[in-house]
């Protein structure tokens, strides 16, 4: 079992619900995983020092940590730090339905990829169409990710736009 600092996935998750009076809502309380559930694989998640850390298990299916609450239009801002050799991401507008591939998580993913292909920030459609927005045509975006450092990201999902 290999341990990776997957604080990436959930540290400082905040969400702005786009309603008549938008208010920021923190998705992670910094203490425990209340309001979250683990889906699919067998990786583990723990909370320490106000951070969520994922512990991957080699050779097992993808594991997802998901909020129990569904959101419509939103702005999601988060910070992440990921170990080399790990491929991760932040799912959004995603589901896990029994009738679809036996509950496999599917939907959009903000890619976190510390490999040399440098696709962090690209959009991948998990368990459906594959790459929707790889960063191969955007070298400046590929250079934005800093391996071994804290990175910031923002996802805006308003109406049909991401």
Give the positions of each predicted feature:
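Bacterial Sec-dependent N-terminal signal peptides
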Residues: 1-22
């Amino acid at each position: 079992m290999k341990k990776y600092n997957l604080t990436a996935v959930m540290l400082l998750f905040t969400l702005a619900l786009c309603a008549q009076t938008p208010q920021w809502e923190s998705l992670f309380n910094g203490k425990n995983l209340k309001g979250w559930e683990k889906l699919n694989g067998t990786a583990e998640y723990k909370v320490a020092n106000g951070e969520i850390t994922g512990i991957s298990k080699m050779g097992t299916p993808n594991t997802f940590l998901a909020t129990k609450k569904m959101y419509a239009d939103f702005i999601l801002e988060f910070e992440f730090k990921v170990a080399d050799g790990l491929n991760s991401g932040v799912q959004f507008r995603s589901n896990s339905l029994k009738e679809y591939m036996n509950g496999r998580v599917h939907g959009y993913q903000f890619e976190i990829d510390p490999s040399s292909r440098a696709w962090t920030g690209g959009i991948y459609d998990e368990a459906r169409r594959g790459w929707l927005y790889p960063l191969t045509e955007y070298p400046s975006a590929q250079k934005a990710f800093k391996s071994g450092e804290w990175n910031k990201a923002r996802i805006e999902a308003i109406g049909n736009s991401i």
